[in-house]
């Protein structure tokens, strides 16, 4: 599954493909190198397939779940919303974008922020977005529940996590 490099006619090396997949995943989820490596280490210690565990960990980040629920237009905006203390997890304020969500967690926008025009606009824009099956969302109340952690097959991110595992296991 080698692809042509845009800049020249040579095929990309195995390392180049692996590095590109890692950079793609880091960019999609907005994670820097050191935290990304820590997610890999944590995924490796978990039971099951390391690559799938890595994707589940990245998908379980609070900023990503806020994005998936449709409370933000982009993951970057979701990160800012969490950072600015607009989000409650199980009724408690959490302002750490990397906070890992568990099954059963209830995520909502703070009561004081719900009436802001910003969230009305966001819900209008993201209303047509498909919410993953592992999340229940009440868009009107800006509240959602994580039914279960996602399985790899329902994560629609175009990343080949096995290449990332190969890269880090060198």
Residue ranges and their predicted role:
Residues 68, 83, 89:
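Short glycine/serine/threonine-biased micro-segments
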Residues 75, 81-82, 101:
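Short, well-ordered loop/turn sites that connect or cap secondary structure elements
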Residues 86-87, 92, 112:
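Short, surface-exposed secondary-structure boundary micro-motifs
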Residues 3, 7-69, 96-170:
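Ferredoxin-like alpha/beta domains used as RNA- or RNAP-binding modules
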